[in-house]
Structures are given as C-alpha cells and as structure tokens.
C-alpha cells in the first residue's frame, strides 16, 4: 500500500478541516500542516439544521492538541517561502517539505484602508486582544466598513462613542438590502430602549427595597421582572441559547472602556442613535496625527463640520470624503479581506516554465470542480481560492466560515479520491462530502443578537435588481417577485421567487422556516398560485409543504 504525504498550508478553518478530514479518510497517510501560528482554528459542536445548513462553534486550540488527537498529523510552525512545483517541495524557514499532494488554505488578510499605528484590522486572536486593550482607554473610535465585522463591533462595543463611516446608503450592505437593514436598525433601537427601561426599573426597585430593608442583587431583580417584560412586550426578541454560529468571536470578549469614563457617563442613556454617528456614503480620505502641521488648517476648515467644536486633544484625526473631520483614539478598518496568495504571486513571476498556479483578478487561486488548481497535485480551499465551476443558480461564493469548512472537507475528499484512483482501495473509500453542498448557498449567523439564516439568492444576487428602490409586491423582469413580512424587534422574513419558484430567502429572528424554505428552493416547487400568502403567519407553511 502506497503511503502518501499531504501538506496543508494554513491552520485556519479550511486548512484544519482539510487535514482532519483527510486523516479520517486516509489514516495511514501522513499529513503535515504548515502554520505561521501555534494556535489553530477548529470546529466543534456541529449541529445539522437541515440538509445543507449547519451550525457550529469555532475554537482556537494548540497545535499539540491536534497532533495528540490525530497521530498521523504533524504541525510545523513556520513561514512558507516558496513552492517548487517541478520537484513538489514546499520551502520554509524551518526547512523543505516534500509532498505528494498539496492543499493551499492560506486564507485571507484584512484589506486595510490606510497604514497607521492607530489603525487596526480584525482577523485573528492577536488583533482581537489588541482591540480589547485599546478599547480599555478609548472615548471615541472610528470604524470604516459595512460588512459583518463592522456590524458585530457596532453591536458589541459599549460606552464608547463610535464614528461609523460606510460607503453605502444603508447599514449592512454587504449582507442586506435596505428593508432588512432598516429592520435591524429599528429593532436594535427598540431592544436597547427596553433594556435601558428595565435597568431603570431595577434601580427604582433597589432604592425602594433599601428603604424597606430588603435588597436583592441586580440579576435577581432582572429575573424577577423577566415575566413582566415578556408579557408587556411580545415583540421583544429573546436570544436563544445554544451553540454560537459562525465566527462568534466577540462573545468571548468584553469590549468595555475605562471605569472612569463609564462613571462619567453613568447617567447618560446610550443607544444605537446616540452612541453611533453614522456617516453614510463616505470613505476615509486622510489620517492626521495630532502633531501634523496640516491638522490645524483642517480644523479651521471644519469648524462647522465633524469635530469643529470638539476641544478634546485626540491622538489621531480622520478626514472623511464628505469633508468631515473627527478626532478619535484609534481606527478600525473593517472593509473586508483579500486572498492571501502573495507567495504564489511571487512564485509565478519567478517561474520560467509553464507550470504556474492561475489566479483570478483579485488574486485568488482558481480551482476546478475537484478543488484542483491549474497545477497537478495542488489543491486549494477557503478564502484564498476562487470557485467558478458551480453550475447551481442558487449557490455563490462568499468568504464565510461556513464555506471554508465545506470547502476544506470537500477538498480532502477530492484529494483522497485522487490518491486511490485505479487502486483496490477505490471502492472502499468513505464519502464524507460531495459537490451537493455547492448546490445551495446556506449560512447561519447572528447580527445584533438576532439569528440570521441566508438561503440561496437571499439578496437577489446576480439578478440585477435594485432592492433598495424595489416595491416588494411589484412584478419585476423575468417574473421575479419579492415578498416580505416583519415584526419589529422580533422577526423579518423575505422570499424571492422567479417564475413562481423560490430561489432565495432571508430569515432574521426565530422563524422556524429554514428547513421548509431550503426544501422549497432545492425541490423548485411551483408557488405562483400562493402569492404573498406564502408568508401569511396564520398558515402553517412548514406542515403544508412537508
């Protein structure tokens, strides 16, 4: 029996999933993970929600734990210098490693808007710890970007003024249209107001109990009032317990500012409106240090805009494209990521033969339907790769943790299949993943404390529709209809039908519709006769289409 050597570059979700999945399929083969960090990201507590949709928790683990759990996996902490394609060798600062198969899962890196010691990007544990440390003394920060990380930060950072610069006309444009974004915006206001009122009730009860000689702690009082609040406000969303979905990294950290600043603002009511100053349709133009000679002139020019009347001596100032100037403690760049393929670009430029790994225009590694690159025996998965082979109308690539896990598992299956091709082992190899998982886009996550399920073309991707100006019940080109229903503070449901068939759905809150809508998209049942009634809450649709 031939023993193959698989080398995996990268210790993120895609890389570790690929390595562990291949180890399961080929326990006698050798697997080596080349990681620049001793901390690897692993997936635990996987729960199947439906055929395609699943939830899981992401944990960070020491590489020694991975080696202990998988005897045929070894982890080398190193920096990859280059790949010798002709001789199948990966060159690193810790030596050279020969491979039979190579899986490049080097992920992506933050797309920083500017270079500055006062600007950080959020990508790994180190940057999260850096953020937490900086926030401990921060009074005001600037967040640039409108994607998932920006939304999570806006929700989690408390008692700190936030200037939020977004290039779009509404929040969350990377995931949501204007209607869904408005639902989240208004729901957060309602919930924040309700939470503030509950704290005031607790405070009043504590004062009264002190007079009566009885004192319960705050947790006991909140628990005591939980039934009252739930009866008086049925639309209040109640966060469900259970496993965190996607990269719920923020749940492990307490993002609060200094005690002194909290004390100074103890009586100030912070909600989404007052705490966050959203600068719509803007981008970061310039960054000035407080010693910059150009700063004084900018302050003079902006005496009626931004921070013109602000007497605080800030370490850094930000000028936005609308001319507004804001002082802050630091800046968070949350403008997405770019494929981490720098080493391959260098290799391709220095390669004198025709064996080069083809990259897309954005620098991602192009793979075929077997996750194979343009070079034999080299595969790729996760944020660093570009999938252009899926023929499904309702699947598209998005750089998400859920897709990184799927791609890592499927890549391991493809490599294992190739390694036993035309051998006696071919018929005995397990099949843990197929390309069926690329038939439907499905992602579960949370935003602003709400469970969010995205299915198919949930935001009409690729349909050339302007949802921000679209009448939800008006018929569009290609017989496309969009229906929505919402209960502010509780749930939002959107469905997109093309020629009477469901092709996408967005579910926010506890709707219990994810499995039903997934089946309707996959089975392409004609729903044209139902119209908007498909979202009628009085109809038990999950039973009707069971």
UniProtKB/Swiss-Prot annotation:
PANTHER family: PYRIDINE NUCLEOTIDE-DISULFIDE OXIDOREDUCTASE DOMAIN-CONTAINING, PYRIDINE NUCLEOTIDE-DISULFIDE OXIDOREDUCTASE DOMAIN-CONTAINING PROTEIN 1. Gene3D superfamilies: 3.30.390.30, FAD/NAD(P)-binding domain. This is Pyridine nucleotide-disulfide oxidoreductase domain-containing protein 1. Keywords: FAD, Flavoprotein, NADP, Oxidoreductase. The keyword Flavoprotein applies. The keyword Flavoprotein applies. One of its GO terms (molecular function) is oxidoreductase activity. Its cofactor is FAD. Binds 1 FAD per subunit. Belongs to the class-I pyridine nucleotide-disulfide oxidoreductase family. PYROXD1 subfamily. Its EC number is 1.8.1.-.
């Amino acid at each position: 029996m031939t023993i193959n050597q698989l080398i995996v570059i990268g210790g993120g979700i895609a890389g570790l999933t690929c390595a562990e999945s291949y180890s399961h399929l080929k326990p006698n083969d050798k697997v080596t993970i080349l990681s620049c960090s001793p901390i690897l990201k692993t997936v635990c507590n996987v729960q199947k929600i439906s055929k395609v949709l699943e939830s899981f928790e992401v944990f960070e683990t020491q590489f020694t734990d991975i080696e202990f759990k998988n005897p045929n996996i070894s982890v080398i902490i190193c920096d990859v210098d280059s790949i010798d394609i002709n001789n199948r060798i990966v060159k690193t600062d810790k030596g050279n490693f020969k491979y039979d198969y190579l899986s490049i899962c080097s992920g992506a890196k933050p797309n920083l808007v500017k270079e500055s010691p006062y600007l950080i990007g959020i990508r790994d544990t180190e940057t999260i710890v850096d953020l937490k440390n900086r926030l401990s003394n921060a009074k005001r920060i600037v967040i640039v970007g409108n994607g998932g990380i920006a939304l999570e930060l806006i929700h989690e950072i408390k008692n700190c003024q936030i200037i939020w610069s977004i290039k779009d006309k509404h929040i969350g444009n990377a995931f949501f249209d204007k209607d869904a974004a408005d639902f989240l915006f208004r729901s957060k206001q309602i919930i924040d107001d309700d939470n503030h009122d509950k704290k005031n009730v607790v405070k009043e009860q504590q004062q009264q109990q002190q007079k009566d000689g009885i004192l319960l702690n705050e947790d006991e009082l909140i628990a005591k009032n939980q039934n009252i609040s739930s009866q008086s406000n049925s639309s209040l969303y109640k966060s469900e317990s259970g496993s965190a979905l996607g990269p719920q990294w923020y749940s492990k950290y307490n993002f609060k500012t200094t005690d002194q600043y909290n004390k100074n603002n103890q009586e100030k009511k912070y909600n989404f409106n007052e705490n966050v100053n959203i600068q719509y349709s803007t981008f970061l133009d310039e960054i000035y240090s407080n010693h910059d000679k150009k700063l004084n002139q900018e302050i003079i020019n902006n005496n009626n805009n931004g921070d013109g009347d602000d007497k605080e001596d800030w370490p850094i100032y930000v000028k936005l494209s609308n001319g507004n100037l804001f002082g802050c403690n630091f800046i968070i760049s949350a403008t997405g990521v770019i494929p981490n393929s720098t080493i391959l670009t260098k290799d391709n430029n220095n390669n004198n033969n025709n064996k080069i790994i083809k990259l897309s225009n954005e620098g991602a590694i192009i793979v075929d339907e077997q996750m194979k690159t343009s070079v034999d025996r080299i595969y790729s998965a996760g944020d660093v790769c570009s999938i252009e082979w899926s023929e499904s109308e309702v699947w598209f690539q998005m750089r998400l943790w859920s897709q990184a896990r799927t791609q890592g598992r499927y890549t391991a299956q493809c490599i294992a299949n190739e390694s036993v091709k035309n051998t006696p082992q071919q018929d005995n190899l397990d099949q843990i993943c197929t390309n069926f998982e690329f038939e439907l886009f499905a992602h579960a996550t949370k935003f602003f404390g709400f469970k969010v399920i995205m299915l198919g073309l949930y935001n009409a991707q690729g349909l050339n529709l302007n949802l921000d100006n679209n009448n939800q019940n008006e018929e569009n080109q290609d017989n496309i209809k969009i229906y929505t229903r919402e209960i502010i503070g509780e749930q939002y449901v959107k469905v997109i039908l093309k020629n009477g068939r469901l092709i996408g759905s967005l579910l926010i809150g506890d709707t219990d519709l994810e499995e039903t809508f997934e089946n309707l998209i996959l089975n392409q049942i004609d729903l044209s006769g139902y119209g908007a009634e498909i979202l009628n809450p009085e109809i038990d649709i999950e039973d009707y289409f069971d």
